[in-house]
Amino acid sequence: MLILAVDTSTNVGSAALYSSETGLIGEVTLNIKRTHSENIMVAIDDLLKLTEHTINDVDKFAVSIGPGSFTGIRIGVAVIKGLAYSTGKTIAGINELDTIAYGTNETDCEIIPIIDARKERGYYSRYSYENGKLVRQDEYGVGEIREYLEDKKDKKILFLGDGALKYQELIKEIMGDNAKFAIKSLSLPRASVIAEISEKQEDNLYTLEPFYLSKAQAEREKERKA
């Protein structure tokens, strides 16, 4: 099965072509300050040309549904739903926090991916490996990073994600020596991971929606002033 996956939920844009039989075929990842609407279709076209495939070769489409950038999520979901609809192929929507956590196989401590939500806030959840399988231990959440970590000070935890990179000093202040940080490349979301997770998942094209988890900053400001 050939899977085309896309991730546009953060500043990083990524597209990957993945075979369920042989693994990753090709991947394009861009961490540049351009809107995903400008480059995601270009990345998909280039990826297909470089790997000598066409869109009709794809058996399944997969996409990050968030949380993260509201605009980025909307773009990615719209693009992949459009491709799945036009080709009549299956679709899968994968949570961004699951994607980031899945990118490491750290087994001797818990894993907390943090996606930046600005102003020392983040999207987060907590994971650990049980019998070789990654298991989510918390609900997906959003809020003050300090408040979320307050009752976790005594645990050894591996942090990753753009929020962990941005607020590394804050996390160190809270956690002390119990905080470990993944190398920077593991904190970048990768579409190839989305593709791998999506192998055993299938969603309804017409009901698949973005997973925002919180209201956009503009909406929060409007409510605050009301």
What kind of region is each of these model predictions?
Residues I32-T35, T90-S187, Y212, Q217:
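Surface "functional belts" at beta-alpha junctions
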